Swiss-Prot record:
The name this protein goes by in its record: DNA replication licensing factor MCM6
Motif range (Arginine finger): 528-531
Gene: MCM6
Domain annotation MCM: ranges: 346-553
Keyword Lyase among UniProt keywords: no
């Protein structure tokens, strides 16, 4: 830009004017390109775009480098190789082009931005050989600074002779004139900046980092500072993966000047008796001169999302409409989206296409798919936000493909962050306040949840996180904000992200006899914030093991052939983007159905037959609503239908019920009674009564046999539920058929034995089955309170046979009991 300053007319009549013929030729050719290049329909392509620049807020014209190559190959090559040198002349050509057609303010500057460069470079490929060349790089934005005004061209006033010195180019730091332009004035230091006549431009500094896909083996991600000017400011936010087009420049490292180790030495010399120096000056340090180091910075003129249409920031952009998305697609792409929306088997096909390498685990695939579609975020009249994002946690044994789900989602979703719970701190997950090296101001550096804003944050080893780190994400999981108050910075940041977490059980393997809460090391507040819990158990099943082994071997031997996708990932991304624009409303019918299902969950939570994995709260009701909305979105419906609620309830039901309950001990009451009798210790005199010594009567042997430990009668939980459901259904059927009806216990036992008559082969088995059904009825009556024994006062009429009635009471089903599906 110093050459451009020298080429400015009127830069000083006493100085020799240096003409850059190459740059001036580029200026003329670029002006010809703007005036002559036509689009496919025969119109001048950049005319209308240039006319929009007269608006006060516009000053940058975006030019496709492909168009430039088509127009003049030599011009495009010169611009690419001498970009820093010719850039001011290109901006002047644009100003001339606009001035010829519209009236513009004289002081307004115009800028050119190039996009669609054919090659993209990695951050670690930027060396000093690429300084000044037009380059395109990509990376993820990890830190953004506030927008500041930057002094581009200064106007100075000489304090000695009052001469005005215009257009002093700033070399990326505050630069004063070397000497006053007045020939009779020798001032070199005393100048005053006239801010009213100087030119400023918007300036923002961002830091980008290499993406994981670009990292060589065993390398740490490198970062680079990018300078954005004019319209490019605020076009990239923390977490965005963007392409930056511009040039590599060298700037003085001002931060090194203020470090303690670089202080100048001015008084190190020893003075003699008369005040003279005893030694001469040795080295530059003795003169107080510091070594000025330099660093590489990327000066960007254009910023674009890495995947501009169906990725980056726009996948979760709530402001777009279905019509605007349709306009972004080609006819073929839109036909594919429409075809997918009409697919009767869309739910299954999307799951298999998204996770083709994972065998089984269909429920987890469905839950993760609904998480990607998400619910509808809402704001109440008081301003309270209700989140629409769905949080999913996968708990399971080792080698059950938990991390594979997280990796698949990270690769598929354009804005996803993968992190490990053990290696992450609270600041790394939320946000950190750091001091800027140059301005020494505190700035906020985005953590994983901020980087995944409007995306998915995948957290592996979630149970290994420290408790204080888990507490830090409470707010982000429910309110979807991150509040920071530290180091004089008070801010509330957005973290509108879905969390997909994977956790291992406490003992390494899931204990089926314990509830979910007892199996994982998570607090109750964290657990209630997850919409879905999926439990993966590594079972020894011959059929399943063969299928999994067959799948893995196929993947290793025939990678391309074994991956069978109905839809490509790009098709799914386009369909996701389109479907997420729907804002389904809940119909009256669905509303009643949701309330009814929630009542079922609450009542079952308090019943004794089945215990839930954790407490059912209002958050589970909101989870059901979000899942129902995600189902409606997936089918591109404007209204939530009862079938959507039914599927949401089924998924929620899978995660709320524990995997397996321990066997039911039917002799529990007798064992407790025996313990009580043993503890009595002969108070009633039974233990002290003498027994026959010789055992002539035979009682002593029987007593010894009975006192031997007896195996308790146990029944599998599933079998216990099956028998109880049979009993309940039969009793209700009898109640419906007859008005005044109730079965006696003996009648119920006889009915059950008759039902299973074909399963009984011997008298001993009959006695055993009869004992089991009697114990089950006793437990259902006195422990689970599913059945009720009618008292004598509750029956109409008869007062006879009260003794027999107490031994063989009438049984009815508790009216509050809900039969399990």
């Amino acid at each position: 830009m110093d050459l451009a300053a020298a080429a400015e007319p009127g830069a000083g009549s006493q100085h020799l004017e240096v003409r850059d013929e190459v740059a001036e030729k580029c200026q003329k050719l670029f002006l010809d390109f703007l005036e002559e290049f036509q689009s496919s329909d025969g119109e001048i392509k950049y005319l209308q775009l240039a006319e929009e620049l007269i608006r006060p807020e516009r000053n940058t014209l975006v030019v496709s480098f492909v168009d430039l190559e088509q127009f003049n190959q030599q011009l495009s090559t010169t611009i690419q190789e001498e970009f820093y040198r010719v850039y001011p002349y290109l901006c002047r050509a644009l100003k001339t082009f606009v001035k010829d057609r519209k009236e513009i303010p004289l002081a307004k500057d115009f800028y050119v931005a190039f996009q669609d460069l054919p090659t993209r470079h990695k951050i670690r490929e930027l060396t000093s050989s690429r300084i000044g060349l037009l380059t395109r790089i990509s990376g993820q934005v990890v830190r953004t600074h506030p927008v500041h005004p930057e002094l581009v061209s200064g106007t100075f006033l000489c304090l000695d002779c009052q001469t005005v010195i215009r257009d002093v180019e700033q070399q990326f730091k505050y630069t004063q004139p070397n000497i006053c332009r007045n020939p009779v004035c020798a001032n070199r230091r005393r100048f005053l900046l006239d801010t009213n006549k100087s030119r400023f431009v918007d300036f923002q500094k961002v830091r980008i980092q290499e993406t994981q896909a670009e990292l060589p083996r065993g390398s740490i991600p490198r970062s680079l500072e990018v300078i954005l000017r004019a319209e490019a400011v605020e076009s990239a936010q923390a977490g965005d993966k963007c392409d930056f087009t511009g040039t590599l420049i060298v700037v003085p490292d001002v931060s090194k000047l203020s470090t303690p180790g670089a202080r100048a030495e001015t008084n190190s010399r020893v003075s003699g008796v008369d005040g003279y120096e005893t030694e001469g000056i040795r080295g530059l340090r003795a003169l107080g001169v510091r070594d000025l180091s330099y660093r590489l910075v990327f000066l960007a003129c254009c910023v674009a999302p890495t995947n501009p249409r169906f990725g980056g920031k726009e996948l979760r952009d709530e402001e777009q409409t279905a019509e605007s998305i349709k306009n972004q697609m080609t006819v073929k792409e839109w036909e594919k989206v429409f075809e997918m929306s009409q697919d009767k088997n869309l739910y299954h096909n999307l799951c298999t296409s998204l996770f083709p390498t994972i065998h089984g685990n269909d429920e987890v695939k469905r839950g993760v798919l609904l998480m990607l579609f998400g619910g509808v975020p809402k704001t109440t009249g008081e301003g309270t936000s209700l989140r629409g994002d769905i949080n999913v946690c996968i708990v399971g044994d080792p080698s059950t493909a938990k991390s594979q789900f997280l990796k698949h989602v990270e690769e598929f979703s354009p804005r996803a962050v993968y992190t490990s719970g053990k290696a992450s701190s609270a600041a790394g997950l939320t946000a950190a306040v750091v001091r800027d090296e140059e301005s020494h101001e505190f700035v906020i550096e985005a953590g994983a949840l901020m980087l995944a804003d409007n995306g998915v944050c995948c957290i592996d080893e979630f149970d290994k996180m420290d408790v204080r780190d888990q507490v830090a994400i409470h707010e982000a999981m429910e309110q979807q904000t991150i509040s920071i108050t530290k180091a004089g910075v008070k801010a509330t940041l957005n973290a509108r992200t879905s969390i997909l977490a994977a956790a291992n059980p406490i003992s390494g393997h899931y204990d089926r006899s314990k509830s979910l809460k007892q199996n994982i090391n998570l607090s109750a507040p964290i657990m209630s914030r997850f919409d879905l819990f999926f439990i993966l158990v590594d079972e020894c099943n011959e059929v399943t093991d063969y299928a999994i082994a067959r799948r893995i071997v196929d993947l290793h031997s025939r990678i391309e052939e074994s991956i069978d996708r109905v839809y490509s990932l790009d098709d799914i991304r386009r369909y996701l983007l389109f479907a997420r624009q729907f804002k389904p409303k809940i119909s009256k019918e669905s509303e009643d159905f949701i309330v009814e299902q929630y009542k079922h969950l609450r009542q079952r939570d308090g019943s004794g037959v089945t215990k839930s994995s954790w407490r059912i709260t209002v958050r589970q009701l909101e989870s059901m609503i979000r899942l129902s909305e995600a189902m409606a979105r997936m089918h591109c419906c404007d209204e939530v239908q009862p079938k959507h609620v039914k599927e949401a309830f089924r998924l929620l039901n899978k995660s709320i019920i524990r995997v397996e309950t321990p066997d039911v001990n039917l002799d529990q009451e007798e064992e407790i009674q025996m313990e009580v009798d043993e503890g009595a210790g002969g108070i009633n005199g039974h233990a002290d009564s003498p027994a026959p010594v010789n055992g002539i009567n035979g009682y002593n042997e029987d007593i010894n046999q009975e006192s031997a430990p007896k195996a308790s009668l146990r029944l599998g939980f599933s079998e216990y539920c099956r028998i109880s459901n049979l009993i309940v259904l039969h009793l209700r059927k009898v109640e419906e058929e007859e008005d005044e009806s109730a079965l006696k216990r003996s009648e119920l036992v006889n009915w059950y034995l008759k039902e299973i008559e074909s399963e009984i082969d011997s008298e001993e088995e009959l006695i055993n089955k009869k004992r089991i059904i009697e114990k089950v009825i006793h437990r259902l009556t006195h422990y689970d309170h599913v059945l009720i024994e009618l008292t004598q006062a509750g029956l109409k009429g008869s007062t006879e046979g009260s003794e027999s009635y107490e031994e063989d009471p009438y049984l009815v089903v508790n009216p509050n009991y809900l039969l399990e599906d």
